[in-house]
Amino acid sequence: MAERSDFWGTCQGGVSLTFDDGMGCHLDRVVPALDERGLRGSFYLLPRGDDWEDRLAPWREVAAAGHEIGNHTLSHTCSGNYTGVRGGLELSSLERIEDDILQAQQRLLPLAPHQDRWTFCYPCYCTFVGQGRGRRSYVPVVARHFLAGRAGGEYGFGNHPATVDLACFWAQTAERMGAFEMIGLAEELTHRGQWVVFVFHAIDGSRLSVASEDFLALLNFLARRRDSIRTATVAEIAGDISHYQAVTGQQRSPSTP
């Protein structure tokens, strides 16, 4: 309870809504729904391909409206264990993944030139390169360049502002969740004074999807509860947590916003 009153002020906890891969449904359906309710989301984009400039151009307006643009790497390299094809993170290196991340960042910067705090999203929630005895975490790479990095997490657990490692904070994958499950997680975990981060991919899609009626019900709940549950971008809440950990002397990961 002390953590709730110390960090969250008049609110009981916080929620961030994150969206991966810069999908068309995010532009067509998610952004308008958020704007209608006065909510802001964090969108993690992949600036890859020869057409990346044209494809990402609409996101300039999204960023200008107050939504967060985040880095999801250039190549979206995940574990080769997902596909059975060699060439994934197991065969990568810290130098290679850092170069990939920084190339993506150079392409993303013009989309949101006003953003002074950038956050990162680990593709497929994988935070390593190499394998066996040569396996290494690339969380320190992310901590070097970003305010925060979104990883995976255990179901039913959020992030405690006093102790969360911002370079590898936890999130709840929302695919296949119904409205009451998402609302229940938001209600219970914020009641405990935690920061709840939801991960969305498709809305009404064929893969990693959430039904639009369930998604909108969550947004309506958060809009109604804005006085008791703070809904803000990852950069906003992570920035406040970083300051809170610094002034209270709590352990925190070094980062360069």
Residue ranges with predicted function:
Residues 1-27:
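Boundary/entry segment of secreted carbohydrate-active catalytic domains
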Residues 2-9, 41, 51, 146-163, ...:
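C-terminal domain-boundary segment and adjacent tail
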Residues 14-18, 26-79, 114-122, 150, ...:
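Short, well-structured secondary-structure segments
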Residues 18, 92-96, 210:
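Short, surface-exposed alpha-helical recognition segments that flank or form part
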Residues 24, 76, 126, 205, ...:
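Active-site micro-motifs of SAM-dependent methyltransferase domains
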Residues 27-36, 56, 60, 64, ...:
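Amphipathic, non-transmembrane alpha-helical secondary structure
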Residues 29, 34, 50-54, 78-183:
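Catalytic domains of cell-wall/extracellular-matrix polysaccharide-remodeling enzymes
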Residues 60-65, 79-92, 187-194, 200-209:
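N-terminal/domain-start segments enriched in small and hydrophobic, helix-friendly residues
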